[in-house]
Amino acid sequence: MKKILLTCLLASASFQVSSHTSEVLSGYWAYQEFLEKFPQQGVLTRELSEVVRNAPVPLKSHQSKPIRISVVFPGQQISDYWVRNLSAFEKRMDKLQISYQINQVFTRPNADVKQQSVSLMEALKSKSDYLIFTLDTTRHRKFIEHVLDSSETKLILQNITTPVQAWDKRQPFLYVGFDHAEGSIALADKFKQLYPQGANYSVLYFSEGYVSDARGDTFIHQMNHSDRFALKSSFYTKATKASGYESAKNSLERYPDVDFIYACSTDVALGAIDALKELGRTNIKINGWGGGSAELDAIAVGDLDLTVMRMNDDTGIAMAEAIKWDIEGRTVPTVFSGDFEVVTKEDSPEHIELLKKRAFRYSDQP
C-alpha cells in the first residue's frame, strides 16, 4: 500500500431515537426514519453492521490496479476521533487485502473555506475513486452537489447519518458516522436521570452548522418534553477549546443559576471545564461528546461528569467494508451509524477499559 500524507493546517483563527429528528433537522431524513421508509436500506445497513462487528474476510475479487482514495478531514483538534477513524480505516483495508493509495489532508473545523475548497478540487483533479469528506456548512453542501453532478468519484460523507432529502435521486456512495441525534438523546435521558426533580442548564454549541443543529437542537428538543428543565442560555462557539472557555465564562457571568452545561463537542467541553475551575463552579455538571481519549482522561480525574462514547473504530471499519462490497459488485447501504455507550465518572475503570478495547480495537494497535 502506497501512502501519501499531506498534513495541512488550514485555519483562519442502542437508544430509541424519536421521530422528531427530521423536524429539528429540516431537509434531512432522520436515521431511523430513512431505514423505515426504505426497508431494503434497513436490511443492507444491518448486514453491514454485522460485518463491522466481526473479523475481516479478505477480498477475493481481482484488482487490476490500486484504488485511489482522497481524504479531507477536520483532524486538527483535541478530539482524536478523526485521526483514530482514519487509522482504523487503513488497518481494516490492509486486513481486507485491498490494494489502495491514499491522500490525506487534515484541516481545522470552521477552517478557511477557500483553502479547503482548493484541497477538495485537487482531490477531484487527481481522479480519485473515492473521496471521504464531511458536511457541516452550506459551502460544503455546494461542493458536494458539484461532485454528485459532475464527477465519477464516489463520495463518502463522514460524521453525518441523516440523508439529504433533496439528493434523493443522487445520494452519495455512503453516509457514515455516529448518529448525532441518537447520541444527544442518550445524553438527554441521562441528564433526566441525574436530575429527577428538574434543573436549569446552558448549551454550548459547536460552530454554526449541521453538527450544532443535530447535537444541540436535538438535545434541547428532548429536554423540552419536560417542563422541569429550563434552558437559561445557549452560545455558538468556534469549535475550539479556547472558544469553549470564553463562551462558558460569558454564559455563567450572565446566567449563573445553572445546574449543568450541555457541550456539543470535546474541545468545547474541555474549554468549559477550565472556565468552571477558574470561576469556582465545579459543582456544575458538564458532559463531553464522543468519548475519545481526552474525554476519558477527564472522566478518570473527575473533571468531566459524563459523555456519550462512540465505539470509535466502527465507522473506519464500515468505510473499508463498504469499499470492499463495491469492488465485489455488491449493493452498499446508503447510511451507517456506529454504536454508542453512555459513560460517567462513577463507572469503574475496569468497565471503561473494556469499552476502550472495543472502541479502539484497531486504532490502538501500533
UniProtKB/Swiss-Prot annotation:
Domain of life: Bacteria
CDD domains: PBP1_LuxPQ_Quorum_Sensing
Signal peptide feature range: 1-13
InterPro entries: Peripla_BP_I (IPR028082), SBP_2_dom (IPR025997)
Compartment(s) of residence: Periplasm
GO CC term (a single one): periplasmic space
The keyword Membrane belongs to this UniProt entry's keyword annotation: no
Transmembrane segments: none
Pfam families given in the database record: Peripla_BP_4 (PF13407)
Gene Ontology molecular function terms on file: carbohydrate binding
UniProt keywords, alphabetically: Periplasm, Signal
Family: Belongs to the bacterial solute-binding protein 2 family.
Role of this protein: Binds to an autoinducer molecule. This complex then interacts with the LuxQ sensor protein.
Protein name: Autoinducer 2-binding periplasmic protein LuxP
Protein species of origin: Vibrio vulnificus (strain YJ016)
